[in-house]
Amino acid sequence: MDYLHQETISFEQAVCWIDKFVDEIEGNRNGLEPYPIALRGINWIKFLSKYHPYILAENKRKWDSSLYAQYQILLDNLEYHLLGNHLLEDAFSLLWAGLYFKDEPIYQKAKGLLLRELEEQLLPDGAHYEQSPMYHCILLDRLLDCYNVSVNNLRFIGQEGLNERLREKAGGMLGHLASVVYKDNTIPLLNDSAEGIAPSPTQLFAYAKRLDMDWEKLPMGACGYRKLMAGHWEAIVDVGDIRASYQPGHSHADTFNYELRIGGKPF
C-alpha cells in the first residue's frame, strides 16, 4: 500500500500507477474492500500533498474524484464485523480524508470513531489490546501520523481537543513500547509479529521526538506480558488472557508463550 513512497519509485511511475488504478477500478473488487481503501487513501493523500505543484490539474481532479468516491464506500462499509486494528485503521484514514477534502461530516465521523476506538483498544498500560508488538508499532506509527497531520492542518472548531487526545494516547503507546522492547530496541515476535513489517521502535521514538513528544516507560500490566532480566538473559513471557476476548485474531497461538534471548541472540 505504500508503493507510492518507496525510494526506488519515480514520480512518473507513481502517476502511472494511480492512473492505472483509477482507470481499472470497476474490475478491482479486492481494491474496493474497506481495509485497502483505508490504507491506500492515506498514501494517496500523502502523495497528492507532497507533489501538488507537479500534478496536472486534470489529473488532480480525476484522482480526487476517485478518492472521494472510495471514501464514500469506506463510510458505508466500516469494519464493525472485524473491529480491532481494522476499524481503527478505518478511523485513522477517515481523519486524513476529512482534513484533505475539508469535509466536516467525514471529519466528525472520524473523530467520534477515533475517540471511541482508542479508548476501547488501548489498555491502561499503553498496549494495544490485540497484544501484538508488531501491530502495536504499526498503529503507533499511524497515530503519530494522524497527530502530525491534524496539528498542522487545523480545519474545524474544537480540533485542538482531538489533537490533545491523540497526543495523550500516543504517549501511552510509546511508554508501553519502551518497556516491551529488548535492550537492542527490537520487539518480541509474539502474536503474529514479524521483522521488517512495521516501523522499528527506534524509528518510532525518533518520529515522536520530532513531534516534540515526551514519554516514560509504563509498567507492563494489562497487556499480559512480563519481562525477566538477569545478566545477559532477557525473557518476555505472555501470561495474560486472550485479548480482545471478542477478537482473538492476533493472540490465537501465543498464549503462555515466551521468548528468551541470551547475549542479545534468540535462544
PLM region spans:
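Carbohydrate-active enzyme catalytic cores, enriched for enzymes
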Residues: A127-F267
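Aromatic-lined, polymer-binding surfaces characteristic
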Residues: M1-A170
